[in-house]
Amino acid sequence: MIKYENVGYNQNISLDTVDMPLYFYLELNNSCNLRCKFCSVSNKNNEYISIDMARYILDELKNNGIYDVYYTGGEPLLHPNFMEIVEYADKLGIRQTILTNGILLDKIQPVLNKIMCVCVSIHGTKEIHNKLTDSNCYDKVLSNIELTKKITNVKINYTVTSDNQNIKEMKDVLEFGNKKNIPISFSKYNNIGEGKKNKCYININSFVENLNILRNEGYNFSVNDCIAPCTIEEKYTYLTHGCGAGYLFGSIDYNGNLKICPSSKRIIGNNKVNSIKKIWNQTSLKNFRKMEWIPEYCKVCKNLARCRCGCKIELGEKLNEINDYIVKTEIEKIWNRIKKKNMKVNISVLRKEKKDYVSLSYPSRKYNVEAVKILEKINNEQRLEQFAEYKDFLVALYKDGVLKEVDYNVEKENRR
């Protein structure tokens, strides 16, 4: 086990800060009336949560002090008992938000006054929106937004992909929101679901650069998805925030399966078998929230508290691993660049301190014996690729400037 830590302040963080999440996503169904190319859901079917199961879940959420529910799917308004579910939740005093494509909003007018907020998806101008959703729904959605706005709060969510990433598209939606006094939020495309199948793409640096331009031009908006600061230029990190999956929020699907995020494929329990509280407090989730599993690459990052290791579900791997696609890609990119190179350890003095060592050169770091042994081997002209199992550690060293590329032939000549 490698130890590579900051000196002077403790960078350890824990997400185990509340007994139960603040809100839950309730996936009412897995069907949809659109075919968005970037959708995070794949393998859609016509399954729905039963009305009895929905009531049972809502009761349990209330009994655990969870009063905020976000209805999602698929398209949640396709649920045949949607209005009945809303009426029941309203009687429990639960605050309700709908995440919808907006096509069916005119059909649920009788219960809109019981909804706290309706988040509608719009993804650019009419041409781009219809292209990305494989439909001709743009005018209908705008009409329903006007209708809904008279009854309750409306928010527009814009998911950014390579097709609608240009600043003109983003500006057009912001102008529409300003004109109608509707808040706008931007989400980045995540490498999951239909988007992954369709090989959708987002240039994260262009995305934040556009957001920065828009902010400097005076536009107000929020950013929904977490963005890891290490993947973008430092001047844009003010636009970033971490992910709340697995501690601030959770998700239950139409089969009663609990997940840390509605976009996750990893099931952590089933509400038909165990209570939400029991599932939420299982050992594996507690260990996840302790964040002791984070790699050295993240442990020494100054933005760890802000970022919290990026997206928790995108790669769909184990709970206790980095699952942010862009972060993992960045690590691999750096590793492939340095693994075949000769490196030298740029540390002038290591001071022994109990069982560990402290470097007395910038940046000051604490190493355990195993880490120091690897540093010694690297200094003995061994290439990094021989230590591939410690990739995250070596990439962290390189980013910190502890590892420097060196030409040993030149060094030998200089020593003669």
Give the location of each predicted region.
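Short loop/turn motifs at secondary-structure junctions
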Residues: 35, 65-66, 114, 153, ...
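Alpha-helix C-caps/helix-loop-beta hinges
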Residues: 64, 151, 400-401
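Radical SAM enzyme [4Fe-4S]-AdoMet core and its adjacent flexible, acidic
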Residues: 92-95, 116-117, 121-274
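Cysteine-centered iron-sulfur cluster-binding motifs in ferredoxin-type domains/subunits
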Residues: 28-35, 246, 298, 302-305
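Conserved alpha-helical substructure of the radical SAM core
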Residues: 1-110
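Short amphipathic alpha-helical segments and helix-helix/interface helices
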Residues: 58, 83-87, 108-112, 142-145, ...
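Flexible mid-to-C-terminal extensions adjoining Fe-S/redox cofactors in radical SAM and related proteins
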Residues: 1-15, 263-372, 386-416
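Short capping segments at the starts of secondary-structure elements
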Residues: 376-385
